Amino acid sequence: DVANTNIFDPGDTSTHKECQKMYEEQISWAKEAGVDFVIAETINWTEEMKIALKAIKDAGLIAVCNFAIPRGDKTREGHSAEDACKIMEDLGADVVGLNCYRGPEMTMKLLKKVREKVSCHVAGLPVPYRTTEKEPGFLNITDHGCNCIPGGNAFPVALDNLLCNRFEMAEFAKDCVK
């Protein structure tokens, strides 16, 4: 597993090279340990995902590319989730999809568009919280049943009431195989 580096800057090519070195180092350790595949996840820049994907494929490993889309339905540079996934498929990703930030319902909304756009395998790994159209990501979610949370933001210490139960997660899993 490799994730966003938090140093990628689309306007600074030196950060692209630094990201490449970071990914190559992590992936070399994974390959030495005998992994079969690498998941690049929680990345919301398409260009950063390209760097991670190249490092995975250059190592001769199966590549899973899961974008994190915190708001709206676009990557940081403005690609729709489905277009970003299609770009990764076209560049050789074996599996594309979405993870993090969004709960099951909001993740599924985007996954359906991804499924229509790509022919490779699709992955969906939502966070287990009840995110909504108004608050699609759990980092900025509010608990409307409680007005005593400092600042009003449930993340990171007051998410308990927003947690999906096992039946909600089972429904997401069932929807994935439809």
For each feature predicted by the language model, list its residue ranges.
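Domain-level signal for soluble alpha/beta catalytic cores
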Residues: 1-178
